[in-house]
Amino acid sequence: MHCPFCGANDTKVIDSRLVAEGEQVRRRRECLACGERFTTFETAELVLPRLIKQDGSRQPFDEEKLRAGMQRALEKRPVSVERLEAALAHIKHKLRATGEREVKSLVVGELVMGELQKLDEVAYIRFASVYRRFQDLNEFREEIDRLAREPGKE
């Protein structure tokens, strides 16, 4: 690390401590050239991939847009804010775990549908009907029948 006082490249770490509930590392450093001491803070940079839309355009991941879409599907459904936030965290974790700098928006849509299906099937159908652009009652019926046939359903 460069010394902020003299610009030298050689510094040594004198002390390291976890701060901010373990989310940050505070390091006390000393410049080997001028002897000045200074403090640095390190945090992990967890960047979410950019989205590739169906038309080929690219845009940054927007957590608020994702939250709003899921909240719209969950409107007037018995799902707590905590469960919604856990689902959002799970989606973001899966996106980061891809290791990709860009992902297709279809991937995000499928992750959202998977999480909504676990949270509330009515919300899942609401979201799927818009996301998959259901055109008539038969498409609703087919999706509901598919849900009913899944293992673990009575």
UniProtKB/Swiss-Prot annotation:
Cofactors named for this entry: Zn(2+)
Coiled coil: none
Record's keyword annotation contains Transcription: yes
Disulphide bridges, residue numbers: none
UniProt entry tagged with the keyword ATP-binding: yes
Domain of life: Bacteria
Domain ATP-cone: 49-139
GO biological process, one term: negative regulation of DNA-templated transcription
Residue spans, zinc finger unnamed: 3-34
Record key words, sorted: ATP-binding, DNA-binding, Metal-binding, Nucleotide-binding, Repressor, Transcription, Transcription regulation, Zinc, Zinc-finger
Cofactor note as given: Binds 1 zinc ion.
A matching Pfam family: Zn_ribbon_NrdR
Any one GO molecular function term: DNA binding
NCBIfam families, A to Z: transcriptional regulator NrdR
Stated family: Belongs to the NrdR family.
Function: Negatively regulates transcription of bacterial ribonucleotide reductase nrd genes and operons by binding to NrdR-boxes.
Protein name: Transcriptional repressor NrdR
Gene name of the encoded protein: nrdR
